[in-house]
Amino acid sequence: MEKDSIKVMARNREAYHEYFVEEEMEAGVELVGTEVKSIRQGTLNLKDAWCGIKDGQLILNQMHISPYDHGNRFNVDSRRPRRLLMHKREIMRLLGKVKQDGLTLIPLSVYFKGSRVKVKVGLCKGKKLHDKRQSAAEKDAKRQIERAMKERY
């Protein structure tokens, strides 16, 4: 496997529907036991996951990693909080934006970069109902334009 090859294991598609993604960052994940093997099998879910900053550390909460089939006693709690690895100054900058601007930290995807597990964290702002309707209308209009162009040629 190449050193920087990227293999996406899970995407949080709901996040793009619920939030405007202002900025994206990459962070490493501190995993224990058989969690990496379980992620390689693709048994993880980001649906309800969110990130928070506690005691100067970035924590990933509610990410579900199913127990590894052959892991027996090495398996850990599937929804335990996991520490994300970023530079201290990056975490402090995120803390300032979250506190001041009312933004949220949401995990957007989990992927392998080489042999390391990485998480793409998004600095997001929540969408209101009218924003969601507008996004749906724009997506629908774009589809109709593409359909018309396809029929033309």
Where would I find each of the regions flagged by the language model?
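Intrinsically disordered, low-complexity regulatory segments
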Residues: 1-5, 9, 137
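C-terminal end-helix/capping segment
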Residues: 79, 86-91, 125-153
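Beta-rich strand-turn-strand
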Residues: 85-122, 126-128
